């Protein structure tokens, strides 16, 4: 059956549109069931993240793509003309290629981002839970996960951070070989600090302290991550606990000065402290780098790392694209092989039916007292005539049409030339 993809992502639509077509996790199975029960698709998987909503479907024919787009608009209450201007579609090989690129991080806002593979796997699992996936998409997604794993394993696509937040956490991991026993003090509660916090949590940080000018905002983030919230004015009392300090506020004046860091390192008995200032203007006085056992990095230091890593990821992406093309070819072979398998099964079933019919005639002949020799003769002739009927008709039609290619194929299939040689 044909495969189609209908999607909207960060390249085609602003967040104001993307949020309107997003699917709530708790309603995903109902949405999938609706899509299938309304006969828009036979199988479906929906990937819905902050940057994309994509519907992967196995359908009766490619004309169903219009039905799927119409269903998406109806489900979310968006007029079809408005929705269509933001949608993109793929079919068959292009659909296979697209899902493999998505799962491998090649279609992401941040090239090579690792989270998307987990999100695609979760979408697949939800579809399985709702019994909305069958042999077509099962095969596609298993092949996709295999290709994405190979891309992750055999290229450097995910080894080099390309966001400020990810770069900051990666730097911390380089300096502290194991951050699972470390405490991080995060100053600010904006999007960048939120991403930093999530990256730290994903990498097993022991404890996070969130400091913000507004305690309520810090508490919201702290509650999400099982962290501790404090006011900016309390930083001096907590700084000595921090192995890692990452700051990103909108303050026009430095929040951490040299003297504060000197007192903290003294209380820490000169255990190393990493400070990463990703604010503009700076949150941490430049003189802090003069303090023994304090290691200060700025946003410019991270940008240089990111630029190098973007280039490295682009090189890795070239190798990844080749792996994806190999994956598309491999999947195509599986599909074609499945078609041949179905044909073989049908052919064998036809032969089995002929055998049973002729065998039944033979048994009746024996019951009626016919000699075994006579029965076997009729059985052999009956089998021969029925088995060669369709090939004989094909050969006559090909001969009448002077279709030499068909005659050559038929002779190879029937083994006629081999018989002459033997």
Swiss-Prot record:
It comes from the Bacteria. One of its GO terms (biological process) is protoporphyrinogen IX biosynthetic process from glutamate. Pathway: Porphyrin-containing compound metabolism; protoporphyrin-IX biosynthesis; 5-aminolevulinate from L-glutamyl-tRNA(Glu): step 1/2. It is an enzyme of class 1 (oxidoreductase). Its EC number is 1.2.1.70. Catalyzes the NADPH-dependent reduction of glutamyl-tRNA(Glu) to glutamate 1-semialdehyde (GSA). This is Glutamyl-tRNA reductase. It comes from Marinomonas sp. (strain MWYL1). The gene is hemA.
